[in-house]
Every structure is written in structure tokens, then in C-alpha cells.
Amino acid sequence: MSDIQRSISRLLHFAQQKGLIAPADAVYAANRLIDVLGVEEYVPHAVDETLETATPVLEEMLDDAAARGLIENTVNERDLFDTRIMDCVMPRPSEVVREFRAHYAASPQEATDWYYRLSIASNYIRKTRIDRNIAWKTATEYGDLDVTINLSKPEKDPRDIAKAKLAKASSYPKCLLCRENEGYAGRANHPARETHRLIPLDLCGAAWFLQYSPYTYYNEHCIILNGDHVPMQISRHTFENLACFLRLFPHYFAGSNADLPIVGGSILSHDHYQGGRYTFAMERAATEQE
């Protein structure tokens, strides 16, 4: 049991280093952690380390939870549980929005830099998985082409697949992009989003939200989602909204998938755009005139 006590101390230390919690929050966070982890008490341990991500500590906690029968040792069960653990050291949504706006007052880039770091520190963006992705550039007659192989989505465990088939049907949240995902605990067939924090945006007078993609296909891959669950539809408003977003975040790009099945976006049921801080081959390509 002393090992899990030390893991709790390590996570509290990490959370304070990354600014997820303040020293005044430590006792409160520790009590939440012992409840989630099924531990009766907390005995602080001295910790002197600097970690890039919480993954090493979370792996210790997950192994311990599986050994004690708290969770089944599958990818989905571990992902659901480590998200619940990290929520114990997360700021509330209103605190994140307030901090984002304070940084935005200095500069939009400072705000997104802070928000992206938060998304990694919270393990919402699983950096250790993202780092496995393979990317390279290939020279073609049309210019350098970016090629990526995304390996950040883990393989499904047969036990998780079986559980998902038996899971009770639910229409809440309506889809993976709905704002109701913020704080949602997840289930066998829906990922946990307890560490998910949205940034409200006003695009052309309508309520939209900013978030980062947890799978990150390119640098600072963000999603701009409609506050309402309405289907994707390319129209004049699409380009007006994209232009409005770029006025708010001039250091980002923004674009929309097609509103067509198969060739378009993967979630056509919810209006959204994608953006980020990356220069694609199309932007670097020379123009031709006939």
C-alpha cells in the first residue's frame, strides 16, 4: 500500500508543477484521489522529480488498481479509470475559461499555448501515444507532400469489444463533439471526457467552442464545434465563421471537411471545423496560371 501512497504524492507533485492545482488544493485533491483509488488514508511522501507527462505515475496507479480488482486490465478500462484519476487534480471549467481569457488579453498565441500545455498535462492529449505517430515529407512533382501514420488510437481489446456490444444504448451525449462531453465519465462504448475543458467562442454572433483533438494529427490540432447539435452543411456561413475564427486566432489556420459521407468529415451529425498551428503542403505550393 505504500507504493500507491507514493504514487498519490507523485501525482499531486506533478499537478502542482504543471499548474493544474495550487498548493492550497493539495489536501482536497488527495482526498478525492484516495476515494477514487479505494484507499482509506493518505500518507504524504517526499517527491523530487520533474515529469513531462503524468503517464509514468498513472501507469503505476492503473497496475495497482488492476491488481486489487478495481478495474479489468484492458485498454478501455484503463483509459476510463486514468481519466477519472486525473479529474481529481483538474481545475473546474470556469477556472480554465477565466485563465484562458486572462492569457488571451496578453495575446491569442499566449492563450492557446497555455491551453495546449494544459491539455497535455491533464492527459486529455495522451502525448506518449501521440509521440508514436510516424510522419515524413515526400517530394513530388507538385511539391513536398506530408505523409502521416496515426498510431495514437490504441488497438481494441476483445474484452472491451464484448463489453461495448452488451452496453445499454444511450443517446447522451448525442455525439463525441457535443458540449455535454465536458466532464462525462464515459462508458464501454464512449470515451471518458472528465478532463475535457472547452473554451467558449462567439463566431458571427453564434455560440461555438474550441477544443483540441485528443488524437492530434498535426501540431495543435484543434476542433471548433457548434454549441448546438446540428449537422454539417457547407454554406456561406461556413466561410464567414472560418474568417471570424481567424480574426480571433490569427496564428492558426482553420478549415472545414466536406459535408459528404465517406469523403467528408468523420462526424457529419455535428457541425464543426478543424484548425491548428501547422503549415500544410497546400499552403506552401506554388500557383500555376494558364
Protein language model regions, located:
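Short acidic (Asp/Glu) patches
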Residues: 192-194, 257-260
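Hydrophobic side chains in beta-strands
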Residues: 149, 212, 256, 275-277
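Helical scaffold of the NTase/Pol beta-like nucleotidyltransferase catalytic core
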Residues: 194-201, 227-254
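Active-site microenvironments that recognize anionic phosphate/pyrophosphate groups
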Residues: 1-224, 228-231
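A short secondary-structure junction signal
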Residues: 222-223, 234-237, 285
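Conserved His + Asp/Glu catalytic blocks
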Residues: 233, 251-254, 260-266, 277-290
